[in-house]
């Protein structure tokens, strides 16, 4: 298994699919990385040379991924909560943020049902 950006990349999958195992790299970004390095997107990771894997590592390093990206997302959410805006309040209360209904749905965000006290 190759290791790129601190993530074990599966050997037996195509390069584009394998790169999506990195947090912050989707299909489009993976295709751009392959195009920039000149690596065949349909080639499997185990068939790549060490030099090609190093090129992939270099390109992935340019993209904001893994811990840095997670930290950035958390900081943006924390900023909304500190501002006290509507989205921040919804985050703070653990409710849906993007306008979804909550009367009947939103169980994932609200958590399990609480029994009604009499």
Curated annotation (Swiss-Prot):
Function, as annotated: Located at the top of the head of the 30S subunit, it contacts several helices of the 16S rRNA. In the 70S ribosome it contacts the 23S rRNA (bridge B1a) and protein L5 of the 50S subunit (bridge B1b), connecting the 2 subunits; these bridges are implicated in subunit movement. Contacts the tRNAs in the A and P-sites.
Superkingdom: Bacteria
Annotated segments matching region Disordered: 93-118
PANTHER family: 30S RIBOSOMAL PROTEIN S13/40S RIBOSOMAL PROTEIN S18, SMALL RIBOSOMAL SUBUNIT PROTEIN US13M
Family: Belongs to the universal ribosomal protein uS13 family.
Designated name of the protein: Small ribosomal subunit protein uS13
One of the protein's GO biological processes: translation
GO cellular component terms attached to this protein's record: cytosol; small ribosomal subunit
GO molecular function: rRNA binding; structural constituent of ribosome; tRNA binding
Key words of the record: Ribonucleoprotein, Ribosomal protein, RNA-binding, rRNA-binding, tRNA-binding
PROSITE patterns: RIBOSOMAL_S13_1, RIBOSOMAL_S13_2
Keyword Nucleotide-binding in annotation: no
